[in-house]
């Protein structure tokens, strides 16, 4: 392995007083991150040479988890994020999501409000999964297709961080970064394909800057896989499909959906085609997300219904041309929800 050619590692400043690092080594600083609106203004004054972004904490999930939960939580996120939008930061840093579905919903809420660049913090646990059981590769597959331009990984254990990066690196098509204790760099932690470093809240950028500059040994590069197959997610696990992937017959999203999904578990189709005919079907889909273990092809005659289904489905949906949609609508669904047109 060889050093990453794009960057020797850049740092995000999190304190206006660290602006002297810019004068010392401008190429080391990739941006400035403020934790509130007052700090954002200070960052703009002290660090005008780099983009200044704003940290946005994801709100807690409601105690009532009954469906429809996804759209309710998106509305909660929009209300929490709306005061930030008028300040027009260069980017937002989403963090603190309770699980992957909450993080995805927060991304949708932010892209509803703003076209600014998005960084998303992704906490990883053991065995390449998040605490809620979501495969980190499945999470990255979704985030990089719905508007997130940089994914920042965090972990309680250094080995969990390295393991997650090894899994993600060949398939990530966005910038990868880490937010970890500076001492991990001192111990030469392996950080494949990492280009960005964000200081922990209790640590100053100055110490991290010295380590990024002087201890590059763990920053190796894992070559990207060739895109001869598509990486998709069912909302929990990652799958690889090609354009000849078998898709089931249409499965109505009615009160028997869970039974039908169980019956199909032993059958051949690699993807389930779910039929959305009315708004109640969207609720049924959300109720049964935990039952879905394969890629999903969503079909609906109405683009409005299709969009509602895309908002609640936590994976990357396929579209096979059933009930032809306008090109402009498909383009929007692809950019907003990561829809994959077969």
Model regions: which residues?
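Domain-level signal for soluble alpha/beta catalytic cores
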Residues: 1-342
């Amino acid at each position: 392995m060889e050093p990453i050619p794009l960057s020797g590692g850049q740092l995000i400043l999190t304190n206006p007083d660290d602006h002297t690092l810019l004068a010392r080594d401008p190429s080391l600083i990739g941006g400035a991150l403020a934790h509130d609106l007052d700090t954002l203004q200070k960052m703009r004054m002290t660090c005008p040479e780099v983009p200044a972004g704003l940290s946005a904490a994801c709100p807690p999930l409601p105690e009532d988890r009954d469906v429809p939960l996804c759209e309710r939580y998106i509305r909660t996120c929009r209300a929490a994020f709306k005061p930030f939008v008028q300040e027009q930061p260069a980017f937002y840093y989403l963090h603190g999501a309770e699980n992957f579905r909450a993080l995805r919903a927060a991304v949708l809420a932010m892209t509803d409000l703003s076209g600014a660049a998005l960084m998303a913090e992704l906490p990883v646990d053991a065995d390449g999964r998040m605490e809620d059981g979501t495969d980190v590769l499945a999470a990255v597959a979704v985030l990089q297709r719905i508007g997130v331009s940089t994914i920042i990984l965090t972990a309680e254990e250094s080995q969990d961080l390295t393991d997650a990066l090894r899994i993600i690196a060949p398939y990530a098509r966005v910038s990868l970064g880490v937010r970890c204790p500076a001492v991990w760099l001192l111990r030469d932690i392996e950080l494949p394909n990492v280009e960005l470093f964000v200081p922990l809240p209790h640590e100053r950028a100055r110490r991290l800057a010295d380590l990024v500059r002087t201890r590059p040994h763990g920053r190796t590069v894992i070559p990207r896989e060739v895109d001869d197959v598509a990486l998709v997610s069912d909302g929990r696990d990652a799958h690889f499909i090609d354009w000849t992937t078998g898709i089931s017959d249409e499965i109505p999203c009615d009160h028997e959906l869970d039974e039908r999904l169980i019956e199909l578990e032993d059958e051949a189709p690699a993807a389930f085609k779910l039929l959305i005919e009315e708004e109640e079907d969207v609720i049924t889909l959300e109720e049964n997300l935990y039952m879905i273990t394969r890629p999903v092809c969503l079909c609906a005659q109405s683009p409005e219904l299709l969009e509602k289904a895309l908002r609640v489905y936590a994976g990357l949906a396929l579209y096979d041309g059933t009930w032809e949609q306008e090109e402009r609508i498909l383009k929007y669904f692809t950019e907003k929800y990561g829809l994959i047109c077969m």
